[in-house]
From Swiss-Prot:
EC class of the enzyme, as a word: transferase
Gene3D superfamilies, alphabetized: 1.10.20.140, P-loop containing nucleotide triphosphate hydrolases
Reaction(s) catalysed (UniProt annotation): adenosine(37) in tRNA + dimethylallyl diphosphate = N(6)-dimethylallyladenosine(37) in tRNA + diphosphate
UniProt keywords, alphabetically: ATP-binding, Magnesium, Nucleotide-binding, Transferase, tRNA processing
Disulfide linkage: none
Pfam families to which the protein is assigned, alphabetical: IPPT
Organism for this UniProt entry: Thiobacillus denitrificans (strain ATCC 25259 / T1)
HAMAP family reported for this sequence: IPP_trans (MF_00185)
Similarity annotation: Belongs to the IPP transferase family.
Subunit structure: Monomer.
InterPro entries: Dimethylallyltransferase, IPT, P-loop_NTPase
GO molecular function, one term: ATP binding
Entry protein name: tRNA dimethylallyltransferase
Length: 313
């Protein structure tokens, strides 16, 4: 127990390609951690290459909770994540171990800390109307509409992020209040003493190089083949949340003949950079986070020292 009388937990947050998984596996080898994935794409079965899902050898050494828990034609929400994560955190703590939550889906981290109790459930009729509106005007037009109603939320979303734009507009219409204002409330605090580590690069150009190299490695490892297999084995369309993930939507467009391989690579890298930028925007204003340079040679030792102090190890 901490000095607060609460069990300890650690958040390891960071943008894509910042080395979160490698650091988490290293920390797990030194401390009594169990890893919980905080990633809206890693929940899907069969989506391995394009999500940089840890390979079998890594998972044998360091198992991860909340991987491969949904089919790619299913949805997964922040509310579902909170339920799943809280249940696993409680079980891990009961085993005398410490939850280490690792990922880059910042909304999930925030929802876990602050709760989503006041947000309404999805409204099928309203969502259908929004989707019909988007089909006529395009999601960027709805993003602009959201910017007028909830600028804080719109600033964090890409203009074509149909799932999240739709949800944010839905919340405004159902409650009369922007989602950002409701997320600022704390209806149910997380009952843990949480050390929050944020991986932020000192050199954005270096992170961009990593992103490009990683996307090239995904293409080499068979990203297009993976998406082709998913299309063959599941009833999918390009608007489903799983297929809106970075890399997957570009591969889908390639398989549809809308873009060539060069454009797939160019658009995929650009979209990944944009994702990293949004993640860093969250992290730079994240209250209570301890920032670590993900490019530093002493990253592991600095992170380990902070964890040791937090756990009293």
């Amino acid at each position: 127990m901490s000095t607060l009388g609460l069990p300890p937990a650690v958040f390891l947050m960071g943008p894509t390609a910042s080395g979160k998984t490698a650091l988490a596996v290293s920390l797990r080898s030194r401390f009594p951690f169990e890893i919980i994935s905080v990633d809206s794409a890693l929940v899907y079965r069969g989506m391995d290459v394009g999500t940089a899902k840890p390979d079998a050898a890594t998972l044998a050494r360091a198992p991860h909770h909340l991987l491969d828990i949904r089919e790619p034609n299913e949805t997964y929400s922040a509310a579902a994540f909170c339920d799943d994560a809280r249940a696993r955190m409680a079980a891990i703590t009961a085993r005398g171990r410490v939850p280490l939550l690792v990922g880059g889906t910042m909304l999930y981290f925030r929802a876990l800390l602050q709760g989503l109790d006041d947000l309404p459930r999805a409204d099928a009729a309203l969502r259908k109307r929004l989707e019909q509106d988007a089909a006529e005007r395009g999601w960027p037009a709805l993003h602009a509409e959201l910017a007028a109603l909830d600028p804080a939320t719109a600033a964090r979303l890409a203009p074509n992020d149909s799932q999240r734009i739709g949800r944010a507009l839905e919340i405004v219409e159902l409650t009369g209040r922007p989602m950002s204002a409701q997320l600022a409330q704390t209806p149910r605090a997380l009952p843990y003493d949480v050390l929050q580590l944020a991986l932020v690069p000192s050199d954005r150009a270096a992170l961009h190089r990593r992103i490009g190299e990683r996307f090239d490695a995904m293409l080499e490892a068979g990203l297009v083949d993976e998406v082709e297999m998913l299309r063959r084995n599941h009833v999918l369309d390009s608007t489903m949340p799983a297929m809106r993930a970075v890399g997957y939507r570009q591969a889908w467009a390639y398989l549809d003949g809308d873009i060539d391989l060069e454009a797939l690579r160019e658009q995929g890298v650009a979209a990944t950079r944009q994702l990293a930028k949004r993640q860093l925007t969250w992290l730079r204003s994240w209250p209570g986070a301890v920032t670590l340079d993900c490019l530093a040679d002493d990253l592991e030792s600095r992170a380990a020292a902070l964890v040791a102090a937090h756990l009293g190890a």
